From Swiss-Prot:
Its main location: nucleus. It comes from the Eukaryota. GO terms for biological process: anterior/posterior pattern specification. This is Homeobox protein Hox-A6. PANTHER family: HOMEOBOX PROTEIN HOX, HOMEOBOX PROTEIN HOX-A6. It comes from Heterodontus francisci. CDD domains: homeodomain. Belongs to the Antp homeobox family.
Length: 229
């Protein structure tokens, strides 16, 4: 087995009086050195390898730089939007490009806002332009303020329960105090105005009925008197 390392047990003789120089060279060093561990005949090959390894190292360094550069470009493309790549670029026109992209984005969003505004205005116009027919009006609402087609307030309709309770109250009291009117309005889910108007109308109806009764009674009495004579 051949070895390129120097064996300390065997003396080594070099031509041209290099023995004294060989004794000064340490056999085992702390670092790796091809010139110290290889014979002189392999010095040229070692130099060639060393010279060949330098471009390899240079290529490796280039590859490392290329990898770093590629990762930097990839990071820039990932973490920055397209409009911000111009600001990341080393050229001085990046700021202007970023501003141009910013203004272009504003101009791009303005038509959308205008379209939404137009659509909302059209929806409001349609909402207000919807015709209201008489059959669509609610007349039985307690707080209704809907007027009829001739500008008059629509007639209030009462439920059967409300009419029955109001008739009972009118049978006992033809005139209500304000306190009693408020109590009835809260009990029947009506307003004071509606209670007041109903009692006014009911009194007018009662007077007409009494007037008719009085006239019929007087007429009947006159007829009896005439027959008695």
């Amino acid at each position: 087995m051949s070895s390129y390392f120097v064996n300390p047990t065997f003396p080594v003789s070099l031509p041209s009086g290099q023995d004294s120089f060989l004794g000064q060279i340490p056999l085992y060093t702390t670092g790796y050195d091809a010139l110290r561990h290889f014979p002189a005949s392999y010095g040229a090959a070692t130099l060639q390898d060393k010279s060949y390894s330098s471009p390899c190292y240079y290529q490796q360094s280039n590859s490392v730089i290329a990898c770093n550069r590629a990762s930097y470009d990839y990071g820039a493309s990932c973490f920055y939007p397209e409009k911000d790549l111009a600001s990341v670029s080393p050229s001085g026109s990046g700021k202007h490009r970023a501003q141009d992209d910013f203004f272009s984005s504003d101009q791009h969003y303005k038509p959308d806002c205008a379209q939404n505004k137009i659509l909302s205005e059209e929806g409001n116009d349609r909402k207000y332009s919807t015709p209201i027919y008489p059959w669509m009006q609610r007349m039985n609402s307690s707080s209704s303020s809907v007027f009829g087609p001739h500008g008059r307030r629509g007639r209030q309709t009462y439920t059967r329960f409300q009419t029955l309770e109001l008739e009972k109250e009118f049978h006992f009291n033809r005139y209500l105090t304000r306190r009693r009117r408020i109590e009835i309005a809260n009990a029947l889910c009506l307003t004071e105005r509606q209670i007041k108007i109903w009692f006014q109308n009911r009194r007018m109806k009662w007077k007409k009925e009494n007037k008719l009764l009085n006239t019929t009674e007087s007429n009947s009495e006159e007829a009896e008197d005439k027959t008695g004579e």
